[in-house]
Regions:
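Hot-dog-fold acyl-thioester-processing enzymes
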Residues: 1-83, 149-153, 158-228
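HotDog/MaoC-like acyl-thioester-processing domains
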Residues: 1-14, 81-170, 240, 244-247, ...
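A residue-level detector for conformationally permissive "hinge/kink" positions
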Residues: 21-25, 194, 202, 234, ...
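Beta-strand-rich recognition/accessory modules
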Residues: 216, 220-223, 228-231, 235-242, ...
Length: 291
């Protein structure tokens, strides 16, 4: 069934509730690479509830997961994550219940031989006070599903990366089984676990979830710039440019200008850039120098 543009852009979902526990918060942190050294107290605060448990800001991408685009006409097995944007209105609680509303913002037709670029937005608030918590915008690229008559103009311009050597770099090696761990957050797409399916759609092995790479980039910023202070991040935006294979090493290059941290991620083993045009927005009180 081809994509129906008018149906697609009319999609809305309101009042979607999501309850999560401190177990979910710790699982997310572990699944993006936090806590590799269990003796390092800085990361232990994200995976051990002895102190007030810290929350990784990009966990919002998991909490915002709503099946808004289910049965929209594209081939689910060929979908790639293109972009992810996040605005944190206040730090995520370690547990709680959320109410989320989601909508399709736009769908760009990149041509029948290319695909469709679809943007959705999700806003979440807490049930305790009904105050905004975060807003996420997600862009997916449905390969081979173009030619449906959607918008043909340019998609939003990316964040520019400074034209100078990076101020700092952070190296994080992913685990061979990291996709198996990350999928427990709720993304059961078989592309990340089924070797036969991965080969059928053009990958040598199952790929790491784009949002896992996204979380790993956030870990790099927390570690290198924020001194592990999760409350210092108020925005986190990326463009995905290539997949990561589990077990590869992600190097995050960072540039800091005031409260804006620009970053890009590359795979050490293949010398491939996997995240471009990254932008992390910090609170005004978090303008320290990269470590």
């Amino acid at each position: 069934m081809p994509i129906d543009y008018q149906h697609l852009i009319s999609l809305r979902s309101t009042g979607h509730t999501r309850r999560y526990s401190d177990r979910d918060t710790m699982l997310y942190a572990l699944s993006i690479g936090m806590g590799r050294d269990p003796l390092a107290g800085t990361e232990l605060d994200y995976v051990f509830e002895r102190n007030p448990l810290k929350t990784v800001p990009t966990m919002a991408s998991v909490l915002a997961r709503i099946p808004l685009l289910k049965d929209c006409g594209y081939d689910y097995t060929k979908v790639l994550h293109a972009e992810q944007h996040l605005v944190i209105h206040r730090p995520l609680p370690q547990d709680g219940e959320l109410i989320a509303d989601a909508r399709v913002i736009e769908a760009y037709d990149k041509g029948a031989d290319k695909g469709a670029l679809i943007y959705t937005e999700t806003t979440a608030r807490t049930t305790t006070d009904d105050e905004p918590l975060f807003t996420t915008t997600s862009g997916i690229f449905a390969r081979g599903d173009g030619g449906f008559g959607g918008a043909t103009g340019p998609s939003p311009a990316p964040h520019p990366i400074p034209n100078r050597p990076p101020d700092a770099s952070c190296q994080i090696r992913t685990r061979e089984d990291q996709a198996l761990l990350y999928r427990l957050n709720g993304d059961r797409n078989p592309l990340h676990v089924d070797p036969e399916l991965a080969t059928r759609v053009g990958f040598p092995v199952p790929i790491l979830h784009g949002l896992c790479t996204y979380g790993t980039a956030c870990l790099a910023v927390l570690k290198t710039v924020c001194h592990y202070d999760h409350t210092s991040i108020t925005g986190f935006d990326v463009r995905f440019s290539a997949p990561v294979y589990p077990g590869e090493t992600i190097i995050t290059d960072l540039w800091q200008d005031g409260n804006i941290v620009s970053f890009e991620c590359r795979v050490k083993e293949r010398k491939v850039t996997v995240i471009r045009n990254g932008k992390c927005t910090l609170t005004d009180s978090s303008r320290g120098e990269p470590q």
